Amino acid sequence: MIAPVSREVVLVHGMSHGGWAWERLARRLERDGHRVMAPDLPGHGRRAHERRHASLAAYARAVADAAIQAGFSRATIVGHSMGGAVLPGVAALIPARIARLVFLAAVVPAHGTTTLQGHITPAGRQMMHGLARANDLAIQYPALFEWSRWMGDLPLGDPRVSETLPRLTPQPLRPLTERVDMRRFHALRLPCTYIRCLRDAAVTPPRAAEYAARLGVTPIDMDCAHNPMLSAVDELAKILTTLD
């Protein structure tokens, strides 16, 4: 009998989340013998006090440092939601340590565009800038909006929702307004996977299909909302650990 392959996995959280968002998935992967890192990006999670240092470059460095410190040499790096805009920077920093990049319900910016410019409608951008101006250049959505947009496949009273909502922190505006340089990413031609969530209200299925096409891949579909690391842990773990 062939022993299962132990994988190195780095989990990159999205907007307003932290490394804590991956706790259920990380436990599942570690139980099966995989090595997992789920760093907090600057301004998030246990690093929420570093909000003023948040940038795409700082995000990418935090992920690269986590992989290096763990001694990973062939890592699967998973970027969720806004984390998709972080992966090109990570690829440029540590290409030799990456086996595959996985975009999970993630934005895939076109070269030279910003996350807000490429993903959010003009009205949505106006709203987000207004929220940021009122909150020290960081965006905090109302809790009901966060639930419906990110966790709509779970009842509002579900423990996974009630545990998550209080842990969400204001999202620094700056990384969302920085232009993403995709040239090095495209030149590296690293293996990529896109996972599309069919009940996603944040990265809708048609938009996710556009992002997958931008990567030149056919998306893998999951029947869930935006946060499968909460609502579809086993299925997500299986996908991540059976990629070539």
What are these regions (language model features)?
Residues 78-83, 87:
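Gly/Ala-rich beta-loop-alpha elbow adjacent to hydrolase catalytic centers
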Residues 197-230, 243:
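Conserved loop-alpha-helix segment in the C-terminal half of the alpha/beta-hydrolase fold
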Residues 136-189:
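Conserved alpha/beta-hydrolase catalytic His-Asp/Glu region
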Residues 6-48:
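Conserved HGGG/HGGXW glycine-rich cap/lid loop of the alpha/beta-hydrolase fold
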Residues 92-93, 97-139, 174-176, 204:
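Flexible "cap/lid" loop of the alpha/beta hydrolase fold
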Residues 35-75, 92-93, 115-120:
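Active-site loop/oxyanion-hole signature of alpha/beta-hydrolase fold enzymes
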